Amino acid sequence: MNNNLISFNPCQDVFLYFDDSSLKNCVDIDIKEGVDTVVFDGGNSQISINLRNVNKQFPDVKTIVINEDVIEINISNFMFPNVRNVVSHSQYFYSGRYLISSVYFSDILKNVFCIKPGENIEEITVDTIEDYAFEGCIETDGFFSGTMSYDFKEKAFAGSAFLNLPSRNGIIAKNGVIFAVDDDATEIIIDELKDAVHKWTGVYSMPMDLDLKHVKKMILHHLDNAESMTVFPETVMITDESYDTKIRRNYCNILNDKRIKNFEAKPDSQSFTIIDGILYSKDGKYLLKCPRGKTGHVSIPEGVKTIGAEAFRGCMISSVSFPDSLTEIQSNAFSCSLIQKIGFGHGITSLGYYESHIFSHCNDLIHVEIPSNIETIGNGTFFSCKNLESVKIHEGVKWIRDSAFAECDNLRSVELPSSVEYIGENSFISTETLKVDSAFGGLLYAFTGSYAVNFDVKKLIIKDKTYYLPLVFNPKQQYLLNRCNKASEFPDRQFYKDAACTELKQNTALYLYENHIDDSDEVKKYLKRSSKQIAYRLLDLNKDDKLVKFIQLGLLSKASLNELLLSSREKNNASISSYILEELDKFSQSTFRL
């Protein structure tokens, strides 16, 4: 025992040792031989008993008493192998045969202790079974009746007799519970449970992170068994004939492990077929699911009409080509995938509708070319494709719906064809320059409205006329401009005064002035009036390069420069202080010459 630990005696002949003076974290224990009851307490609130890594054993203890201030207990079954009674005065634990905690309305089995064959057993009725809960347990009967489902941690049965049960079809299972995979299995079959208890569900309980060891192939006779799993082998054969229906009900995320590289089907399947490891409906018209671990190019065969929702979500393919027969791509079909190149074919006319997000979060996309056969780009189709740099939209596209290209931070410039009649709200909100053939309704709501960009103004080009717009308009002016339906209706003026806030007004005016777009007296006078405020803002934001450029414009008075010098020194900004001194010296030289 570490002599630096603090001892506490909760009951006769029991000594708990804490590593803190407040007695909140118990890390060691001693119990005299013959003691059959141990009390967990520390005399303070919020006590944690952390003894799992303490290699001591107290076989005489039959009862554990948990006082009201104990909130956490981590112990090994081997420390108290013969405990058969838990008495709890804490709201975080139950009294009973086993150690069961209650956390956020979830009951967690932590310890059954080392139960021997033939002992009286109580059925497990909890939500979750913790790692090592059955460690050292020799009995395997009576715990599970098959009437409940559980959330098993990966090592729930480690060190128990459950793992010594005989395997069948590569799995070790009993009473509707899969405990482990056979060490030597390369193929496993998870069949459909058909006993009296499970006939309505056909589903096992099993650890979510079931260790597949050397398994290369899994045969699933009931798809719902996959809902409990997060780990799969590289090949999955599905014999569940209801799979087609379940996929169409958006169950496809249950087979979304990137380790899956191929799907297989029964040769006589009535529901689906396999082409190049990808799952299709039996008639080949509906692409249901691509294995997430599939790589390289995918050429979807002619005859396919629909790509299902999330069919390629998170996939590792690099490119795809669509057949001319394709008429529908459902929501999130390619979302979060590693796709780099898309061949749209000549058949499809719409990339989704109102809930699209077909290619959202595809961060390997650099360039996209939208062909003339596509009329509609649906909501969020390319939302948050962070590395998308260029988009070529051909004549023929008519509608670009809400957020279609929103949060594409590297898409700095887009030119729309004259066929475009409508662009939805926020569709180009992250784009710096937008070129259109004519003004039309919705233009301002689509293009402006975000502060979260790394440039100062928006550039709207209508025909050959460039307008420099604030990032965000005041609502009234945005509404009025948004109603312009042709180029002649769009006001021929500067818009810095229409910005939503003072900072954006200043940024827009400054951009116009320093780039010689508008260096009129009106803009210059406005910037002079605002010069001190602008300078202090840039100083506070540590935007030294911008501040230097602003000082070079000569808009700050000598008095303002002196005040700015004091502020820069207070902030220990030596480079700005030095530059201001140089500018003040120019003032002195100019005065002397006069």
Where are each of the predicted segments found?
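Structural signature of tandem-repeat unit edges
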Residues: 1-72, 78-131, 135-154, 158-174, ...
